[in-house]
Amino acid sequence: MPEPNLCRHCFSVLEEGETVCSACGQKPEAPNPDAALPLGTVLSGQYRVGMVLHHNDLLTTYLGWDTEKDRKVQVEEFFPGILKRAEDGRGIMLISAESKTLFRTMASDLHDRWKRLMEVNHKAMLKTLVLFSENDTLYRVTEYLRMEPLEEYLSRQKGEMSLTDARQLISPLISLLSQLHNMGLTHCGISPQNIYVDSRKRVILDGFALPELRTVGNGLHAELYAGYSAPEQYSKALWQGEWTDIYSLGAVLYRMLAGQAPVSAELRGERDDYLAPLGKLHPDLPEHVCEGIMKALSVDHKQRYRSMEAFSAALLEEAGANTAVFRPEAPPRPTEKPAAAG
């Protein structure tokens, strides 16, 4: 059976004579950005590169096509800001030779993190299909699911979400983060931009990176999320840990229930805090839910919950009930690590 005529950008089937893809709106001749791999590049002899989905100072993420299994995939390329594209359009070059050690260190840390993520089997995370090295850099291929960012999903809700719906969306994320934390891994990029929802309300957490990308002053242009990144992420002198993810998840819940994002952590202080209490914005919410979310959003990380299980128990427990909606058994915690340690 002949291969259908696919759009070079999004791999949707093009109808005969179609000059602009009806799915993504791109013309076949339109190229990828200069710093990205060219459209049609085949990696590992199997994965064809399509459009750029996201780019930051650490990774370039592409939509890909698995030529062996005829399916869409997601391809992440380690391409930090200290690199530029080689003349052949595929390889990489250091902008400055002085960055060689930094590149090697980040590559090693990223490879280790990706290998750890391969150990995770959870419905709220994209499954890693393969890791490989090519073009003098690293690649990770994951499954691809057609979903929309939570940010867009919430904008269509036209205001706050019900507590029942918020719990339905957040419970799988609490379960996933509990598993990651028990492995000694944190996300530190939780926001409505990195959470995805499908038509059946399945939720996925994506946007995994290195701590260097999630901390100001750590060698990369930090990719933080106003209102969702924790105060400690705005200084490399402060410690990050489970409590950082708890802050961000609390901020996501605040957005869901209040209908507005929390004020940025940069504008908050322990004395002068401009964050409106959730109970004042939504007085119909149960008091213990409001208190739980506001505790998670404490400026001082020592005042927050110290584990996802504790946050879950306080937040998801029905008033007067003896059991929580989600309360997994947790093994002993790994030793806390500073932000720069990964």
Which residues are covered by each model-predicted region?
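AlphaC helix of the eukaryotic protein kinase fold
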Residues: E87-E119
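Protein kinase catalytic-loop region centered on the HRD/HxD motif
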Residues: L173-L185
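Activation-segment/catalytic-loop signature of the eukaryotic protein kinase fold
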Residues: L131
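AlphaC helix of the protein kinase catalytic domain
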Residues: L150-M161
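Conserved end of the kinase activation segment
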Residues: E232-E242
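Conserved HRD-motif arginine in the catalytic loop of eukaryotic-like protein kinases
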Residues: R304
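Activation segment signature within eukaryotic-like protein kinase domains
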Residues: L169-I170
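Conserved short submotifs of the Hanks-type protein kinase catalytic core
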Residues: N135-P149
